[in-house]
Amino acid sequence: MAEPRNRTISTSPFDQNSGFCTETKTYHSLRPKAPLPPATTPLPLTYYVFSLLHKTTTANSARPVLIDATTRHRISAVELESYTKNLASSLHQKFKFSKGDTAFILSSNSAHIPVLYLSLFSLGVIVSPSNPSNSNPEISRQIQLRRPVIAFATSATAHKVRSNSLLHGMVLLDSPEFNSMISQEGEFPRVEVLQSDPAAILCSSGTTGRVKGVVLTHRNIISAFAGAYALRRARVSPAVALCTVPYFHTYGFIYSVKAVALGGVVVSMGRFDLRLMMRAIEEYRVTHVALAPPVIVSMLNNSGVMEGYDLGSLEVVRSGGSQLPVAYGLTETSGGVSRTLGSEECKVLGSTGRLDPNCEAKVVDLETGIALPPSKQGELWVRGPFIMKGRIMYHLFEHSSSLLTAPSYVDDEEATATSVDSEGWLRTGDLCYFDNQGLLFVVDRMKDLIKYKGYQVAPAELEDVLQSHPDIAEAAVVPYQDEEAGEIPMALVVRRSGSKVAESEIKDFVAKQVAPYKRIRRISFINEIPKNATGKVMRRELRKLAFSGVASKL
């Protein structure tokens, strides 16, 4: 696997409005540059997090920084540092981890998960969380892929892990043993963790193909936190963030630790429940909440649920995975690339904001490979210190009955090279453009583009039109094979309750608003749009529905 690309951002002059450099044909961040520690300095993410925490909690280190909304358990800034050190010491003494070992984590959200993450980071152990709702076969495949030496689970998820195949077995996070580990004081020799060392293996969503294992280094995540710290704004009281997004997902993984490092409070929910969320917002005076798009849709469609709760503390609602874009990022970029800041940027509908600090980008023509100026659509390429270290292979090693002597994760250099070139540019696979003010617009996934008689049709554009129809609750558009056109746009539509809107009416509605080649040619009515745990539409499942024969061409 290639070494991390710690290239210096170009100093060529660029337009101060758009960030576009006519000489290099690249876009530069218009945000203040975020200071980073020297790349060669050994520094685990844990120590960087606590260095920020010391700056942001000097006035009151006894206040809570982690709260479990389910159990009401609270952890203060002082306790977080103490618990992290104690747990790291206990784990070192009991298991004698080697730097580069991988820990598999299968748990719902709780206040102890960030403690576990930080402890493992300090030991140089690679954190690899997974979705607790995955099936037993899926868990087995992920363990074969990631090659952990230990698993951390709960009494509710332990049955999914074959712990006898792991070198150090399994630790239950809701057991007296774990509680003893975080409370028992101890010391351990400091592990020299390089910033270029892997910190985490996360899985991208896999909405268009097989789930991909993404390796993020300590440097990648440090740069993401540094960018957020540079953009922070002074507050009279700490921000209180309710994280309903799973901690195994990139957003939740980064958010659960970053918010604390920036001086905030993170309130976690072990399982999502709309009324429990409302109570938590009211009880803990939540200011920021991260929600999957379907949750927001549910709140809007069932506004009565919110009655009787004081939600006046809310300042920001964040969402990702589908429309409601206020920011843009990938697992491969440690979470962030661009975001909207301030009321003026937020007024520009459809924009995902300006590039984050220490980020540069270019928009590349799909046919010629030439970098394009503002207002031209092409594939977005990004570069910066937050770009992943690489990908991992999907060998299942079916003939191996044990992982006791297996190495850590296996690099997939070929897959990495197809995503990140020799100059450090990550190909996002997203069709995008910048406007003359340096605001990024994400049009669609390139894999999802429909090729109709040589024209490229973006499903997201048609989905926006469909969802503006008063009788449509949700809609998604996929390509459907056609002998004459190659592919035609097909819509899968969920009617609103009580609606009997007809296919012909929907086709006419769309046809009046788009070019002829973009018209919906085929429609199927379904009960729900398939989505993954983080709210992203599962395109593969949609295509299966489209090809199942339930649709009729009119």
PLM segments and residue spans:
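N-lobe entry segment of adenylate-forming
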Residues: M1-K94, K99, S499, S504, ...
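Conserved pre-ATP/AMP-binding loop-to-beta segment of ANL
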Residues: S61-P64, E185-C203, G209-R210, R233-V240
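Conserved AMP-binding/adenylate-forming
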Residues: A69-H73, S90-N134, C243, Q456
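Conserved AMP-binding A3 loop
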Residues: R74-E79, E192, A199-A226
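Conserved ATP-dependent adenylate/AMP-binding module captured primarily in the ANL superfamily
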Residues: P132-R162, S183-Q184, A224-L242, D273-T287
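AMP-binding/adenylate-forming catalytic core of the ANL superfamily
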Residues: N134, A151, V289, G384, ...
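Conserved AMP-binding/adenylation subdomain of ANL enzymes
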Residues: I222-V240, F248-H288, S298, N302-S303, ...
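Gly/Ser/Thr-rich phosphate-binding loop
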Residues: A261, V286-L291, L300-V348, P357-E360, ...
